[in-house]
């Protein structure tokens, strides 16, 4: 009974934080599906990553807030006060997730497990022989609470995003990947530094204070 009471208190506290969250309110006002859009927005505004005409691959895309943000950046006219982007899409956005995603106008969505070769082949087919300008990875595993197992799962997903970027991204392109502080963090930073000419670590203001997430941004591939 005590555990149930504790759990309900935790759930109520989370719900209270969520309802009163500035970014949750802003997302509703501006028509984004999740507050995560503002994490990418800050990273983009800091580094100037997203430009019209690009090919952007969004890994771990559901519910679609990052794809929505990219979609708006690739329109000749951006919507104000919420709603969808205005005007034709100038660029290509391919989103992928193991979970379903409600359509985002102009975005190609593939549902499947990025770890499976046939899903990767579908993604390559949608790229039509082009290399990506930008790869986004908001992929995160289901965490077990066992540090060593969770670290391995996190590291595996980021390694897959790194491998994809090395093989399918322009040399001058960029990779944005979500990582978590813990046993996998330092090895992943090392891998990024081995792979990219410049590496930035950003914890956006929209990341919750209690969250251990950080985003690694790799700019420009080193020859391999």
Swiss-Prot record:
GO terms for cellular component: cytoplasm. S-adenosyl-L-methionine binds at residues 64, 66, 97, 113, 138. Its EC number is 2.1.1.166. Its main location: cytoplasm. It is found in: Cytoplasm. Keywords: Cytoplasm, Methyltransferase, rRNA processing, S-adenosyl-L-methionine, Transferase. It catalyses: uridine(2552) in 23S rRNA + S-adenosyl-L-methionine = 2'-O-methyluridine(2552) in 23S rRNA + S-adenosyl-L-homocysteine + H(+). The active site is at residue 178. It holds the Pfam family FtsJ. The keyword Isomerase does not apply. One of its GO terms (molecular function) is rRNA (uridine-2'-O-)-methyltransferase activity. PANTHER family: RIBOSOMAL RNA METHYLTRANSFERASE, RRNA METHYLTRANSFERASE 2, MITOCHONDRIAL. Specifically methylates the uridine in position 2552 of 23S rRNA at the 2'-O position of the ribose in the fully assembled 50S ribosomal subunit. Belongs to the class I-like SAM-binding methyltransferase superfamily. RNA methyltransferase RlmE family. This is Ribosomal RNA large subunit methyltransferase E.
């Amino acid at each position: 009974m005590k555990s149930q009471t504790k759990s309900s208190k935790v759930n109520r506290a989370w719900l209270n934080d969520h309802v009163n969250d500035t970014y949750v309110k802003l997302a509703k006002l501006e028509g984004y599906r999740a507050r995560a859009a503002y994490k990418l927005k800050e990273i983009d505004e800091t580094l100037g990553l997203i430009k019209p005409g690009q090919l952007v691959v969004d890994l771990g895309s559901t519910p679609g807030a990052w794809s929505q943000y990219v979609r708006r950046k690739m329109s000749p006219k951006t919507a104000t006060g919420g709603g969808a982007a205005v005007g034709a899409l100038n660029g290509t956005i391919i989103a992928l997730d193991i979970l379903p995603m409600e359509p985002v106008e102009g975005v190609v969505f593939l549902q499947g497990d990025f770890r499976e070769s046939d899903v990767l082949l579908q993604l390559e087919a949608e790229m039509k022989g082009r290399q990506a300008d930008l790869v986004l990875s908001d992929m995160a595993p289901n965490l077990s609470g066992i540090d060593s197992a969770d670290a391995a799962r996190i590291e595996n997903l980021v390694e897959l995003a790194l491998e994809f970027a090395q093989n399918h991204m322009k040399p001058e392109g960029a990779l944005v990947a979500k990582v978590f502080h813990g046993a996998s963090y330092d090895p992943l930073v090392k891998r990024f530094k081995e792979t990219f000419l410049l590496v930035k670590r950003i914890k956006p203001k929209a990341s919750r204070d209690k969250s251990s997430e950080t985003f690694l941004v790799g700019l420009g591939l080193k020859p391999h």
